[in-house]
Amino acid sequence: MNNFPRATTALVFAFSLFSGSVAAIAQSTKSTDQTQTTNSTQADSKTTATSQASQPKTTPARSTRPLSTNEDPAMIGKRNINGGIISKMSGSTEKEVRQGREAAAEVDRQAKFIEDPMITEYVNRVGQNIVLHSDAKVPFTINVIDSDEVNAFALPGGFFYVNKGLLLAADNEAELAGVMAHEIAHVAARHAVENQTKASLLEYAALGASIFLGGIPGMIYQNTAGIGLLGIFMKFSRGAEEEADKLGIQYMYAAGYDPGAMATMFEKLEAKNKKKPGFISRAFATHPAPPDRRASALALAARFPEHEEYVISSSEFQRVKAKLLRLSNARATTAGAIQTSDDTG
């Protein structure tokens, strides 16, 4: 559409809203000792020797209730999770990628990126491993934004951005993977594309109402519809967030990660943000999740066939985090020296 470039910034904001992911899940009360193992898909890295230490599981007591097709990790890639009418109206995969690429171009113009290959290759490898074990039908491009703000977002078509602040906030690789799996699930389920389709339908409805009402009353109706209703779709619905939780937990499990780590990461970030408001981005913490959403997500994980071992962390994660900290400290030292020079000059 001709007016898409003008609305690109708004769309980027809409697509990037993490919408409650911080409070997506609560940590389970059950803890059992567990030995971690190297994720087999990460063995392709010539420089990575995964070093793991025992940490407690976070999944609750096992359940024998049968899994539905959309709940079963064994059905990943074999099922259709986009069967709704809105998804069908949202167009082809090619259209999704095209729209995402245009929005990503705006992000690329405005953001500053981490270019250190050790960091970018590691984050890309973790993300691509999850994509490989997901329902996504588009290729993913993953970049690390040089920002201390805790955030991550994925645009339609698989254009995925992870902030440096998120890497620093995670205590292990599984926690990072939990956030990435949730975002990959939003793309796999086409949530942002569906949001845009809903917004377009509302625009058409508002236009029709303005024609029907006519004159100034119609113009007022059109303007309020555009401001109020479109704002509703600049964030994911509770249903979309719950679906991303459940799909993301399946993707973590399939990729070899402890699915409970998603709970610990989001709960940790929520607690830190309560102690220090602004710790995470406003978009990242838009909607606190109710306890039943947390419980249902972890209850689903308890119904998966139990792995003897899960990946929790790796020596490479620790090296990447240490390097990010060194880069951040060096920058802070340089900035302080410049400020001191300015003050004394």
Regions found by a protein language model. Give the residues of each.
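A Zn2+-metalloprotease active-site environment signal
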Residues: 9, 27-345
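Sec-dependent N-terminal signal peptides
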Residues: 1-29, 251
